[in-house]
Regions:
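Early-domain small/polar-rich strand-loop-helix modules and first-structured segments
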Residues: 1-129, 206, 277, 284, ...
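Acidic, glycine/GT-rich loop-and beta-edge segments that sit at the periphery of enzyme/chaperone cores
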Residues: 2-12, 16-18, 31, 44, ...
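Glycine-rich phosphate-binding loops at beta-strand->alpha-helix junctions
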Residues: 175-190, 415-437, 448-453
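Gly/charged contiguous loops adjacent to phosphate- or pyrophosphate-bearing nucleotide/cofactor binding elements
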Residues: 104-127, 133-144, 277-436
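Conserved phosphate-binding/catalytic loops in two-lobed NTP-binding clefts
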Residues: 199-213, 434-461
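Glycine-rich phosphate-binding loop of actin/hexokinase-like ATP-binding domains
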Residues: 49-51, 57-74, 80, 220-294
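Phosphate/ATP-binding catalytic cores across multiple sugar-kinase/actin-like superfamilies
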Residues: 14-33, 149-167, 218-230, 378, ...
Length: 518
């Protein structure tokens, strides 16, 4: 639990939640800070970097997003606050960001273009990318997810340092990095090692769960851009942070309240790791809409390809599936009345063109393929099922409610206890996801930040400032699952229960001994 002194407050009055009320400290310490406090949202599909600083005139924290220089494949330079988490080897040069992302249609995944590698961290498989052109013979190697992450952060660090120098900021950079709340120990370890390789010094306490970072950012912005959160007298509001990105569906349930020490925020539960993200929606569309249609247009049958080649073809269809999904979501978001899909009277069609994929049967080509809103509605039924996931054609697809229900159960709450739902991540802007959650949690207030993709990085930069400058952690991380040992009698002994604040006090176990054989 994180509980920080507020000082005196008026009993009986509702309290407006703010960063200063959560992190009461001597803010004068931040004046003339001898560092630049950077937060990195290392996303599966998009990475965003922000920095926070103390504004003495306004006596408040301010956040700005850092624009990142990116080279296009033709050598042209551009700047953007959103950096695609993509690396490509093209024309003997390594591209990171938009230039690499634009080559998804041309290059082969894990051979000369790498993306979605974040979710492969923690896999102890050695050189996983067997076809990688950046192999052991090259000075820069990408043979697994940790290699790719290291190369990505090498580029990112250079761009951050260039921005800091150009802006005349303090070159002593203090970092915080956001991670999925459900990231397991081996995934966190690989990330920290990839950062360390590039001399990005991030302690475990400087990592912040993405839902918690989103919470901090929303609280900072709510006075100006969003619905402010108040704590009524005697009430401890509960917030479900729904972070649905390209590679993860992260749930964090927070309690906000006031005790004798002041305002506090604490995690009640976080979701366990489930293989679910917006990429899985793309995968379903590719397997069940695009691949069958591609076969029909080329006069082929599903039996014409073995599973390994089918997977390779589908991998090349993923970028087109993503384009269809994003296009459909944008079209519906323009015309629906918030959270009510029944207002959509007409059918919409989104089209992708000029698909060419090499195969053992020759080049598979399509001048045009499409997806209708009726088809997309059927796709989204798979991911909003209340009864669990689906297995179709050997592919497993999880539902958002697996993570949501397990988090609510672990928190000891019921659905009626959830006061707020905060949407974070690009996939949370999917209208079918929002409509489903509104129907399932009809009495909860739904909170939408101004920019779901920048929000987490801003929260990470706030954490960088609060933690690195003041030594405070506003929302302490907790264990998502219990840590147990199996005893000699095959009994399960819990060492650290789920939901335990980390770092925790010393836990004493006096009924456990190591047996000595012989």
């Amino acid at each position: 639990m994180s509980s920080l002194e507020l000082g005196r407050y008026d009993e009986g009055m509702a309290i407006l939640l703010s960063i200063k009320s959560l992190a009461t400290a001597d803010w004068k310490q931040l004046k003339g800070a001898e560092a630049t406090y950077v937060g990195i949202d290392f996303g599966t599909s998009t990475t965003v970097v922000s920095y926070s600083y103390y504004d003495e005139l306004l006596d408040s924290i301010k956040c700005d997003v850092i624009p990142i220089r990116q080279k296009e494949y033709d050598g042209a330079m551009s700047k953007s606050e959103k950096l695609p988490t993509v690396i490509a080897l093209y024309d003997n040069q390594i591209l990171v960001g938009t230039g690499a992302s634009s080559l998804k249609y041309e290059l082969e995944k894990n051979k000369d273009i790498w993306y979605s590698f974040k979710m492969e961290l923690g896999e102890d498989l050695g050189p996983k990318y067997y076809n990688s052109t950046l192999n052991r013979e090259k000075s820069i190697q990408i043979q697994n997810a940790k290699d790719a992450t290291s190369v990505f952060f090498r580029f990112l660090k250079k761009e951050i340092e260039n921005f800091v120098h150009t802006k005349g900021l303090n070159d002593n950079i203090k970092y915080a990095v956001s991670i999925p709340a459900s990231f397991e120990a081996n995934q966190r370890r690989d990330l920290i090692e990839a950062l360390s390789i590039n001399q990005i010094d991030v302690s475990k306490q400087a990592l912040i769960d993405e839902p918690n970072a989103a919470f901090l950012s929303y609280i900072l912005d709510s006075d100006t851009f969003g619905e402010a959160i108040t704590i009524p007298n005697g009430i401890n509001p509960k917030m479900l942070v729904f972070d649905f990105g390209a590679g993860t569906c992260d749930i964090s349930i927070l309690e906000i309240g006031v005790n004798r020490k002041g305002v506090y925020s604490k995690n009640l539960s976080i979701s366990k790791f489930e293989k679910l993200g917006g990429d899985d929606i793309d995968r379903y569309i590719a397997y069940n809409i695009l691949y069958p249609e591609l076969l029909v247009q080329n006069g082929l049958d599903s039996d014409d390809f073995i599973m390994s080649e089918k997977r390779k073809i589908v991998n090349n269809l993923l970028v087109f599936a993503e384009k269809l999904k994003i296009g459909m979501c944008k079209a519906i978001n323009l015309i629906w009345e918030k959270y009510d899909l029944s207002t959509i009277a007409q059918e919409y069609t989104i089209v992708v063109k000029d698909i060419h994929i090499e195969s053992s049967k020759g080049v598979l080509s399509s001048s045009e393929m499409q997806m209708t809103s009726i088809q997309f509605a059927e796709v989204m039924k798979v991911f909003t099922r209340k009864t669990g996931g689906v297995i179709k054609d050997g592919q497993e697809y999880n539902s958002i409610y697996q993570s949501i229900k397990s988090s609510i159960k672990k928190s000891g709450l019921s659905t009626s206890d959830i006061d707020y739902v905060l949407f974070i991540g690009g996939s949370s802007m999917n209208p079918y996801v929002q409509a489903s959650l509104k129907k399932w949690l009809p009495n909860s207030k739904l909170l939408l930040p101004c920019d779901t993709q920048e929000h987490v990085s801003k929260g990470a930069s706030i954490h960088s400032l609060i933690y690195n400058a003041l030594g405070l952690n506003i929302v302490q991380p907790i264990t998502s699952e219990p840590i147990c040992v199996v005893t000699q009698n095959n009994e399960l002994l819990t060492l650290v229960p789920a939901g335990m604040t980390m770092p925790t006090d010393i836990i004493e176990i006096d009924n456990l001994a190591v047996a000595r054989n012989g």
